[in-house]
């Protein structure tokens, strides 16, 4: 994409993410109302997320009616050779339900299976993380980069654990133990996209995830690469299709990867291009 094309796409992405974030904030009262209405709060949150995704699709469609749009709440098969927007209008649904701030809007533009731009918007804190391929990463318009000076013993790591009933859970818990012993503190992630944005901004030093999907990963991949962080798949598939990935400051890679250990290739990879 040319610089002019990227600039236009970035403006559209910003408008779409802000529209979704504003809807999430305005709709929080509907969760509280479930105490009276007896409606399922998770179902209400799902409806709110679908509405936010529809807003994003509408904003994008006005400028790019020819582009594919693939969202968590409305997945479609993305096609090689076509531009596709990957969206998660509510990444961190559990925290949204509880009124916590650890949720975000995630949006990325992928062209020929390569993420070109990514934005992660934290509406609770009004923090907008954005990155354009080859042009760096920003937080609310100011350049950001990953942390490079943290001693390994003081590293702040984050793990996106799978569901409690996942066959991967035992493996991931073992990884948490090794990383906590061999590096520094480890916290459990709720919003994967927001965690990757925080790594890009130097707030944490490493992140890894099992059962990841490209809705969350695409925006984070651009942010991480453009901030100077390393991001890699662990399951021998292209990064955008990976279900298990890790990211960190370059100086931590060797130690971090050794502590994580190998991961088996899973037949249940994220939806592939075709």
Q: Whereabouts are the PLM-identified features?
A:
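Short loop/edge segments at beta-strand edges and connector loops
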Residues: 71-73, 141, 190
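Generic detector of well-ordered alpha-helical packing
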Residues: 50, 89-92, 96, 123, ...
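N-terminal subdomain of lithium-sensitive/metallo-dependent phosphomonoesterases centered on the IMPase/IPPase/PAP
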Residues: 1-90, 271-274
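Residue-level signal for inorganic ion chemistry
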Residues: 20, 24-27, 60, 93, ...
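Small-residue (primarily alanine) positions within well-ordered alpha-helices
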Residues: 13, 17-20, 137, 220, ...
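An extended, acidic
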Residues: 147-274
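A structural micro-motif at secondary-structure boundaries
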Residues: 139-145
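DPxDG-like acidic metal-binding loop motif
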Residues: 79-138
